[in-house]
């Protein structure tokens, strides 16, 4: 089977794990007036890519992919625990937990997942989404670079989808933003794959604060 098909499957917004219900703090930033137009959205997303995704979340995900591919389950669980510990708010923690749970349910219902993989998934209580994604990538023999690229694409696409619901920006404006951000997505991919353990860093205090405020936001469309 062409490895492109399962890659597109995992990156698809149609994957039934509920990603469309989360904005990862973007809705809160809009409500506070931090984000209000295309330029401010681009700055918000660029900062997320540079200060969080490229140098922390994507490198952790790459390590989980490598560990799963090599059958190093203790390493996989170690990096998954690092990821869970970095969820600084209840909403961000619940987001990853819920989508991880939903992806486990999906994989358990598919013939591709063998018994060994099912057993390993049972070894982590409430597995976060990137851990389950890594197991899925192993199941379909996806290489690390392609899987991280798909992960980054899924993150950006979901952010733009949330933006179109929460701001009066149409699909064309979102596509223009996508064109502007794709080179930064390339940079994020290369940074993530080259990141050493000593370089892992997460400096998005604004995201954490926005996420905390969102927990008590009076009117909201999204769960984060």
From Swiss-Prot:
Example GO molecular function: nickel cation binding
One matching Pfam family: UreF
Compartments, record wording: Cytoplasm
Main subcellular localisation: cytoplasm
UniProt keywords, alphabetically: Chaperone, Cytoplasm, Nickel insertion
Gene3D superfamilies per UniProt: Urease accessory protein UreF
GO cellular component terms attached to this protein's record: cytoplasm
Top-level taxonomic group: Bacteria
Bridged cysteine pairs (disulfide): none
Database matches in InterPro entries: UreF, UreF_sf
HAMAP family found in the cross-reference section: UreF
Family label: Belongs to the UreF family.
Physiological role: Required for maturation of urease via the functional incorporation of the urease nickel metallocenter.
Assembly, per entry: UreD, UreF and UreG form a complex that acts as a GTP-hydrolysis-dependent molecular chaperone, activating the urease apoprotein by helping to assemble the nickel containing metallocenter of UreC. The UreE protein probably delivers the nickel.
Name this polypeptide is given: Urease accessory protein UreF
Native source species: Nitrosococcus oceani (strain ATCC 19707 / BCRC 17464 / JCM 30415 / NCIMB 11848 / C-107)
